Every structure is written in structure tokens, then in C-alpha cells.
């Protein structure tokens, strides 16, 4: 935490009558703090700083204490001696230690005294670097980092840190871990609007200052969202780009209310586009809401909600380079020319925008598609819907809504002790699509060679024609039984958690921290009928409870259906010692994790519970300042 000294300038000259104490109230960077409260202790006199931060209070000769308060900043008091002339007192307020605890304690951020390799990207630089890309792309110029947009679908980016993939990079938003509790992966499409709400992003490479039990061997990414602004106002921004890209962002802040105790902030984002790669369209919303309430000098509460309901077409299949350009492939030393020679599997090329995960379809096909994402038929759609585009069908589409709600409490117990806690809920509803049953490709592919033969595309019209004329009298006299369909692979989850950290300053050199990390999650996995592709029903044989097969229609569960619970409890203790040019850091933690699994497609439908897994975590580091510009750490 950067602590900047209060700057006070007093100018006194003699006079006979009541004079004024005047000055400016700014932050440490000299930005005016409009609306700051300026009061004279023990009196009813006071005022509010103007838009330029200026204040003025008339006082009789005497000695007074002037106190300035502003939400999100440390209150400051200064003794003022009034004589016979005006007195000028300028206040430069430092960010509140409680506010910084949201950054440093809950999110475990590193600073210049932490023996950690880190890079922090502020809001202005974030907007400049990122534009409308996925969040990882803002870090692509950071040492030891590789980020890629992969197939080009919105939100399909990934990041590697020091050679480790996202499963080994802890991602946190406002101090709350966001890695999947089952496999550790991070799905950036879930956070499509987080960059618009981000105040800064810090990437800690390798050993991190994070003391939670997170998969952070590669590093840790801390994303801090905008606090509720004390200044009233709004902003509208619109961005456009290739592929019919259009993004509109609206933000509004209420400013201070309720006696300068409450501030609210909100952002809403709408993003649409056809995509550069074929059929990688995007149809997304994003929202962010923040509230800050200063209950008293010792307690502040913050409420955050962020989410990004979205749908987008994907490009997931890897291709031989000759699929895109045979000329480019031929220029590569050592490339096997038989891969695209006449009569071989790459007789044609698809071009750079080629995408195997879609295909054209006749607009005469009016079949509905089923998908669900927190609200059937609601604001974000769901239920039985028309397909995204009447002229084509995506084999691979992602749709998901993962809201995150945090309630933070920051408490100053005394001058040496602070308590920071966050209670959170993270939901999740949506999934990805694919084929199920028999499929048609063009040009036709023999057997299972489809994954080696390219470029080919989907022949949806052939599939629809087959399914539309396929009466199976064993199941129904007149209705058509689909041979192949589109399916949803869905994930629905609810995660609740509590993170609490107590900081105690033992001395000027030593600070200790103890903490608790509790999480519990319930997760459902299944596949559903998305599109019957011209038929009236499909027969599925995956459920042991229906050994003769099960007739399914739009929205019905097929293939598999299981539920998982994850229960997590952990604790830690951490110490940070600073003396002159030396800084030492160390922490130790203990975590216990329990899993349960229930397969609903078994006759027993039994809940299988695994024994708890207990793990120990230990970290340590040291840093030595050689001079003000050079330091070494391990």
C-alpha cells in the first residue's frame, strides 16, 4: 500500500475580524475530491468541497481542528491557529487503508516490497492495450506470458504463464477465486465484460502473494473492479470494427448520497458481431454494479455484482496448415507435400477464415432449438428458440451466464488490527453444443476418418431431409425418428464461499495475517436435446433406468446426467518482515477438500462420497534493495 503524507500549508497574517480557513482537497495525485466533507471539530461549522476541491469556512481567532472526510479515503485532521488574516490549508488525502485492504488483503496484491515478480496494468493502459479483446490479451507483452485468441471465437482466449496453462494460473476477481472447482480451467467467455469494469489487473508470475489454496504454480491474476465512484456522472462509449462488430457501453455513478455515506455505480455493455472467422458471431451482454457504504469510521461495506450472459459461435478444430493455404504450407521447410498433393486428403484449401464448426442450412427449415441460461424466455433468452441465423447452423456454439456477487466488509478494529471479509455467490448456467448420433459431412468422409480429413463441412440439409422422412413404426406410426441431432452439454452450478483475513501489525517491521477460506459448490452435468434436425423425436439408450430406450424431445436429458459437490475449507498464517533494505515473506496453509458424485443414469442413483483430501501449502521469499532502482529477490 502506498501511504502519502498529508500536505498542509499554513499562511497566517494578523487581522481584527473573523477570517476564513480556505484550501483545496485533492487525492495524492492532485485530483480534486469534489464533495469531500470539511468540518471544524467540536462545532457545527463545516462545508463541502466544490467541483475544484476548494473549501472555505469563516472562523473567529483561536485554535481549531479541521477534519476532512471522503468516502474511500482516510480522514485527515489538522490543527489550525486563526489570527487576524485568512489561513490556507490544503489537504491531499491518501486512499483509505481499509480500501487498500480490498486490494492487498482480499486480493493479496503484491507491491514494491513484495518478493514477487509482478506486472500491474492500470485502467488507462488496460483500455489502450485491450480494446475489445478478451482479458488475457492485455497481458501478452508481459514477460513469461503467452496469450492467444485461439480459434477466434469471442471469449475463447487462453493464457499461459511460465509455460503453465490456465489450470495452473489462479484467476481472482475482487479476491474471489474463479478457476473451475473441478478441473481448474478458466472460461473467459464467462467474463466478457469484466475488462469494462476493471480498475486494474495484476499478474504475479511464479510464487505469488496469494495465500489461498489456489492452482497458482504458474502465477496469479488479480482483477480489481471499479469502486463505486464518489463523483456523480455517466459515460457512453461505442466501438465498431471488422466483422460487423459493434459494442456499446454505458456507465453511471450516483455520487455520494445519504449524508455522503453511500455511492452506487453501474455499467451495462451490449456486444454483437459476425466475427472474422466464419460463423464466429457473438451476441453478448455484460453488467457490473457496485455499491459502497461507509457505516462509520471503522466499518465499510461494499456490494459487487458482475456477469456476462453471452452466446457465440466457435472454431475449435485444429487444422493442417494446408487447409488454410497450400502455398504457405509448401513454403515451410520439411513440410510433407503429400498432405495436399492431388488425390491426398487436402485437395482443396479453405482460406484463413475457414471454420469447420458450422454449415449452411436452408431457410425453409423452421425447427426450434432449446437452450437455457438463467431464465427461460427471460431477458437473456432460453427455452425453445429460433436459431441465431436462418441461413446457417453452428455445430459448436457456447452459451453461458456466470454471475458473481460479493459482499465485502472492511473493519478497523484498532490502529494495529484490521479485519477484511468477503461473502460471495458464483452461479453458472449454460453449456456448449455439438452433434449426437449420425451426421452428414460434405465432401463425405469414410468411417471415423473425419478427424483427419479436411477441409470438409457439415451437410445440415441432408441430415434434415433424412430425419424428416424417417417414420419408425416400432415407436410411432406417423412421427419421424431423428437419426442424428444437435445436443447441449450443460453445466449448472452454485458456489458459495467466505474468505476472511485478519491483519495485525506486531511492530513497525513485522505484520502478521491469519485467514479462513471456505467454499462449497453443487455442480450438475448433462446433455440435452438442442435441435431434432427435422425429426419429431430421438431415441436415447444411455439411461440404465430405461433399458428399452427413452423417447426424447427438445430439452430432454440424454447421454449422461450427474451431480457433483465440492466442499472446501482452509486456513493460513502469513508473516511479512521489513527492515531497512530487507524484506522477508512466508506463509503456511492447510486445506481439506471433499467430493461427492451421483450418476442419475444408474438404477441405484447412489451418492458416492470420497474421503477428504488434506493438503499443506508453504511459500517463502526474500527481497533486498541494492539501491532505489535495483533489487534482487528469491
Features from the language model and the residues they span:
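Short acidic/polar hinge/loop motifs at secondary-structure boundaries
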Residues: 56-58, 177-205, 224-225, 333
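Transmembrane beta-strands of outer-membrane beta-barrel pores
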Residues: 238-244, 254, 270-274, 307-311, ...
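Short, acidic, small-residue-rich periplasmic hinge/interaction motif at the N-terminus
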Residues: 37-41, 69-73, 83-128, 166
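Transmembrane beta-barrel wall of Gram-negative outer-membrane proteins
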Residues: 233, 240-272, 277-315, 324-326, ...
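Short, acidic Ser/Thr/Gly-rich low-complexity loop/linker segments typical of extracellular
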Residues: 43-54
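Extracytoplasmic beta-strand/coil segments of soluble accessory domains associated
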Residues: 136-177, 199
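N-terminal periplasmic accessory domains that precede
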Residues: 86-92, 135-138, 157-160, 172, ...
Amino acid at each position: 500500500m502506498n501511504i502519502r503524507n498529508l500536505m498542509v500549508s499554513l499562511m497566517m497574517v494578523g487581522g481584527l475580524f473573523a477570517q476564513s480557513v480556505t484550501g483545496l482537497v485533492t487525492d495524492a495525485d492532485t485530483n480534486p475530491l469534489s464533495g469531500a466533507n470539511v468540518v471544524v471539530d467540536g462545532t457545527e461549522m463545516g462545508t463541502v468541497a466544490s467541483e475544484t476541491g476548494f473549501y472555505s469556512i469563516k472562523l473567529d481567532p483561536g485554535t481549531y481542528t479541521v477534519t476532512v472526510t471522503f468516502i474511500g479515503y482516510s480522514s485527515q485532521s489538522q490543527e489550525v491557529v486563526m489570527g487576524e488574516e485568512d489561513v490556507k490549508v490544503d489537504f491531499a488525502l491518501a486512499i483509505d487503508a481499509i480500501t487498500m485492504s480490498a486490494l492487498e488483503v482480499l486480493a493479496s496484491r503484491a507491491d514494491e516490497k513484495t518478493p514477487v515478480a509482478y506486472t500491474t496494468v492500470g485502467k488507462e493502459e488496460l483500455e489502450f492495450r485491450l480494446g475489445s479483446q478478451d482479458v488475457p490479451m492485455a497481458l501478452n507483452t508481459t514477460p513469461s506470458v503467452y496469450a492467444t485468441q485461439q480459434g477466434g471465437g469471442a471469449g475463447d482466449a487462453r493464457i499461459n504463464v511460465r509455460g503453465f496453462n490456465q489450470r495452473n494460473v489462479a484467476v481472482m476477481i475482487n479476491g474471489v477465486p474463479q478457476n473451475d472447482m473441478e478441473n481448474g480451467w478458466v472460461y473467459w467467455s464467462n467474463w466478457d465484460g469484466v475488462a469494462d469494469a476493471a480498475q486494474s489487473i495484476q499478474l504475479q508470475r511464479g510464487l505469488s502473494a496469494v495465500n489461498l489454496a489456489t492452482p497458482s504454480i504458474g502465477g496469479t491474476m488479480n482483477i480489481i473492479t471499479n469502486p463505486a465512484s464518489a463523483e456523480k456522472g455517466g459515460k457512453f462509449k461505442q466501438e465498431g470494427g471488422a466483422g460487423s462488430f459493434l459494442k456499446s457501453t454505458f456507465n453511471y455513478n450516483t455520487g455520494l448520497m445519504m449524508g455522503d455515506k453511500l455511492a452506487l455505480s453501474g455499467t451495462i455493455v451490449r456486444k454483437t458481431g459476425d466475427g472474422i472467422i466464419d460463423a464466429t458471431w457473438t451476441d453478448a451482454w455484460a453488467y457490473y454494479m457496485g455499491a459502497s457504504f461507509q457505516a462509520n469510521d471503522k466499518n465499510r461495506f461494499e456490494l459487487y455484482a458482475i456477469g456476462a450472459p453471452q452466446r457465440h459461435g466457435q472454431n475449435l478444430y485444429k487444422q493442417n496448415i494446408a487447409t488454410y493455404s497450400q502455398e504457405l504450407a509448401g513454403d515451410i521447410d520439411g513440410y510433407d507435400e503429400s498432405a495436399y498433393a492431388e488425390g491426398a486428403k487436402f485437395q482443396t484449401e479453405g482460406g484463413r477464415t475457414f471454420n469447420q464448426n458450422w454449415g449452411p442450412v436452408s431457410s425453409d427449415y423452421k425447427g426450434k432449438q432449446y437452450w437455457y441460461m438463467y431464465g427461460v424466455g427471460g431477458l437473456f433468452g432460453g427455452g425453445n428458440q429460433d436459431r441465431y441465423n436462418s441461413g446457417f447452423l453452428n455445430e459448436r456454439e457456447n452459451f453461458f451466464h456466470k454471475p458473481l456477487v460479493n459482499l465485502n466488509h472492511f473493519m478497523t478494529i484498532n490502529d494495529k488490527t484490521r479485519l477484511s471479509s468477503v461473502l460471495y455467490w458464483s452461479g453458472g448456467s449454460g453449456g456448449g453444443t455439438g452433434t449426437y448420433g449420425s451426421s452428414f459431412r460434405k465432401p463425405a468422409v469414410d468411417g471415423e476418418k473425419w478427424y483427419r480429413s479436411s477441409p470438409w463441412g457439415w451437410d445440415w440439409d441432408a441430415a434434415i431431409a433424412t430425419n424428416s422422412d424417417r417414420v419408425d413404426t416400432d415407436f410411432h406410426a406417423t412421427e419421424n425418428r431423428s437419426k442424428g441431432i444437435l445436443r447441449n452439454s450443460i453445466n449448472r452450478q452454485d458456489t458459495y464461499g467466505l474468505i476472511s483475513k485478519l491483519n495485525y501489525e506486531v511492530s513497525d517491521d513485522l505484520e502478521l495475517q491469519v485467514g479462513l477460506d471456505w467454499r462449497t459448490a453443487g455442480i450438475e452435468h448433462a446433455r440435452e436435446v438442442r435441435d431434432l434436425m427435422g425429426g419429431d423425436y430421438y431415441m436415447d439408450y444411455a439411461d440404465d433406468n430405461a433399458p428399452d430406450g427413452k423417447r426424447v424431445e427438445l430439452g430432454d436429458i440424454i447421454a449422461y446426467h450427474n451431480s457433483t459437490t465440492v466442499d472446501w475449507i482452509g486456513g493460513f498464517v502469513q508473516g511479512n518482515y521489513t527492515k531497512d533494505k530487507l524484506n522477508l515473506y512466508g506463509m503456511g496453509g492447510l486445506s481439506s477438500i471433499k467430493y461427492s458424485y451421483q450418476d442419475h443414469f444408474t438404477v441405484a442413483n447412489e451418492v458416492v462420497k470420497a474421503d477428504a483430501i488434506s493438503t499443506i501449502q508453504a511459500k517463502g521469499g526474500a527481497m533486498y534493495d541494492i539501491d532505489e532502482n535495483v533489487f534482487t529477490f528469491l
